[in-house]
From Swiss-Prot:
Pfam families: RE_NgoBV. GO terms for biological process: DNA restriction-modification system. InterPro entries: Restrct_endonuc_II_NlaIV (IPR019064). GO terms for molecular function: type II site-specific deoxyribonuclease activity. This is Type II restriction enzyme NlaIV. Its EC number is 3.1.21.4. Keywords: Endonuclease, Hydrolase, Nuclease, Restriction system. It catalyses: Endonucleolytic cleavage of DNA to give specific double-stranded fragments with terminal 5'-phosphates. It comes from the Bacteria. It is an enzyme of class 3 (hydrolase).
Amino acid sequence: MIKLTAQQIFDKLLDEEKILSANGQIRFFLGDVDIIVKQKDVVGNIIQEWLGGWLRKREIEFDVSTNTQMPPDFFLNKKDRSRELLEVKAFNRNASPGFDIADFKMYSDEIIHKPYMLDVDYLIFGYDMDDNGNVTIKDLWLKKVWQITRSMDGWAINLQVKKGVVHKIRPGVWYSINKKNMPMFECLEDFVSAIEETVYQNPATRHNASLWKRKFEEAYKKHYNRSISIPRWHEIAHKYKKK
């Protein structure tokens, strides 16, 4: 087995596997019936499973996370599960990214105990499926969470909100060249600032707001042995409005 970083896996998929010129199909067998799956909504989960199969076949070391509610999907360092964390996402490249980053409440609780969760690498497949069920990968990205998230009207971070209840953190369109779109966060510190502000904005988490920032900074210093300074959202909010 060989150890690879997320960056090395990304490079290998592009340069050796030529993933952007590969073709595939999703086939399903049951009894004596064999079909080609043509429903696009299953492709994302299949790609994640495919990557696990690819890692095994290429004899790349990894463990699968048992927590399906939170990143990462894969641990690339079996001995240190606070490093080399890989999350796989996929979306229909002909539409905007429709995947979830994480449940907001769980995520905001998690990172004040495990600040290294902010260092997860997101390997993102932009796929296409034609009418015959042929699947191709149109784009592949390797990003950190703050590079694929943004603010939204009324909230410091882009969220799925149903009937006033906050559910999931949602991505922005990080590859857009439309300058009128809300920009992605510029750095880890600004992303964490948006999380803190949302902890306060969200009625379900507001009781944690007064101590949240301090707890995060203390946990970060304990883990990394260096300090981090998180700005208040009102100091940086102007950077993340629509142009």
